[in-house]
């Protein structure tokens, strides 16, 4: 993975979480790799997950298959960012 590309993906993931979940820019800016997401953010319920994944697909130009979606990828900000980077950057 290229560092520049990874940072772009991280910024995109932050933007998606901010926009889809209605989180403040300040709150999302404080997210670290170990910041818990699903089960810890009340805004990220099962319905919101679909919106987040769809928006990631649109913004990153990727396709997320149903069988790729699991609790681990949504466990933390770092896990979601790594998943998105893996799809976007190959």
Kindly give the residue locations of the regions a language model identified:
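Phosphopantetheine-dependent thiolation modules in NRPS/PKS and related acyl-activating systems
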Residues: 1-44, 48-54, 58-59, 63-90
């Amino acid at each position: 993975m290229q560092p520049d590309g990874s940072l772009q993906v991280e910024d995109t993931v932050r933007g998606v979480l901010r926009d889809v979940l209605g989180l403040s820019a300040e709150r999302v800016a404080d997210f670290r790799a170990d910041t818990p997401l699903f089960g810890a953010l009340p805004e990220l319920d099962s319905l919101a997950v679909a919106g987040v994944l769809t928006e990631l697909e649109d913004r990153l130009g990727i396709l997320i298959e149903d069988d790729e979606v699991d609790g681990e990828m949504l466990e933390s900000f770092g896990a979601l960012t790594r998943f998105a980077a893996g799809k976007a950057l190959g």
